[in-house]
Amino acid sequence: MIKLECLQDPSPRKRRTKLLGRGPSSGHGKTSGRGHKGDGSRSGYKRRFGYEGGGVPLYRRVPTRGFSHKRFDKCVEEITTQRLNEIFDNGAEVSLEALKERKVIHRETSRVKVILKGALDKKLVWKDAAIVLSEGVKSLIEAV
């Protein structure tokens, strides 16, 4: 028969919390499990992910592989004819600078492609060679 005093809690999450700095017999007295001196013994210290005690970390020991072209790629954005209708007046000049001033495109953008979506009611002047028109937009401009 099981005695009442022999019953154990089945769940390990109700484990007793570690009492720190409560004398040598507790097992966590004096330095409270932090050891002597060094960064880890100081308050507020958090070890950075990947830190290996001052040695060269793994991510620097492993050789790099491949090449990313992301830094050198030209930033291209799309803009619709519908949006151009909202932004520009009739007879206005469309250029990268004009689009950047109106905050339609990002300042790092080097090319823009105009895509046909909705009508283009206004007659616009295309100044920049960096603005590429889709076939649908070209046919729409010729019709106007």
Curated annotation (Swiss-Prot):
Family: Belongs to the universal ribosomal protein uL15 family.
Entry GO CC: cytosolic large ribosomal subunit
Record key words, sorted: Ribonucleoprotein, Ribosomal protein, RNA-binding, rRNA-binding
Ribosomal protein as UniProt keyword: yes
One Pfam match: Ribosomal_L27A
Region feature (Disordered): 1-48
Claim: Ribosomal protein is one of the keywords in the record: yes
InterPro entries documented for this protein: Ribosomal_uL15, Ribosomal_uL15/eL18, Ribosomal_uL15/eL18_sf, Ribosomal_uL15_bac-type
Function: Binds to the 23S rRNA.
Protein name: Large ribosomal subunit protein uL15
A single MF term (Gene Ontology): rRNA binding
Source organism of this protein record: Chlamydia trachomatis serovar L2 (strain ATCC VR-902B / DSM 19102 / 434/Bu)
One annotated GO biological process: translation
Subunit structure, as described in the record: Part of the 50S ribosomal subunit.
